[in-house]
């Protein structure tokens, strides 16, 4: 079975369009074990995202904070927010993901719905996500309506598009009203920080095969090395070294799976200084050595 992969550009912006031009929303039935490395690497997109756990635990990294979501919880991710996802101890985690373009829900930009209801969330850097926890009556109602939305999307009966839009308006109305006090603490989104992160990710992803110095990276965004490190950590929750190691290991997967190269060759092709460092980094991420990866993967199919 082919492993799923989030397709991104050099800045880690997701390339996949969610839904269609005429109906810009979709529902994915996700399983972390179906993704390469049993995790979703850091990425971001312009759409709103809701995660509805079905089985197991998933840990979302949003900026510097981790959110553990379980069945009975709901996580709403704001647009343009870098995020990643993994499960503790590589355990199974199944969840449904709802993705929608914001204007599909609020309609015309500048309308009262966009300006009064959505703008305090969409342009608020202090609310990158909203976690609805189990045991709350609002959460239970939201889950019920998300399940209705999922059923309609899967069955695609007559007028399912209209019914889904109505349900999404109800869902977002409940979530935003429930967190009205949080939205009142408005901090305008810092577009410059996102642009600088894009520049750093672009440089790291383009030059991962080479030795990259922190000074080189800092020079790309005209900041000191210290500020560069703080900004990267703030926006991704990861250190630059940790991100680069993870990215290099992910880039090594197709080479490992091809069985055409030695560990020394793969280490050299993916920017590791030697095979031992590559093997250790691979083991940290996947829990096995590169040589064991293919056989273990076959056993679990």
Description of each model-found segment:
Residues 169-185:
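Linker/hinge segments immediately adjacent to helix-turn-helix/homeobox DNA-binding domains
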Residues 174-179, 199-249, 261, 265-296:
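Basic/polar phosphate-binding segments, predominantly the helix-turn-helix DNA-binding elements
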Residues 80-103, 110-113:
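Ligand-binding loop in jelly-roll beta-barrel domains
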Residues 1-74, 80-81, 89, 114-116, ...:
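Generic protein-terminus/edge-of-domain signal
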Residues 157-159, 163, 182-190:
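Hydrophobic/aromatic-rich alpha-helical bundle segments in the mid-to-C-terminal region
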Residues 114-167, 202:
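Amphipathic alpha-helical segments enriched in hydrophobic/aromatic residues interleaved with Lys/Arg
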Residues 56, 138-155, 196-207, 251, ...:
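Solvent-exposed, amphipathic alpha-helical segments
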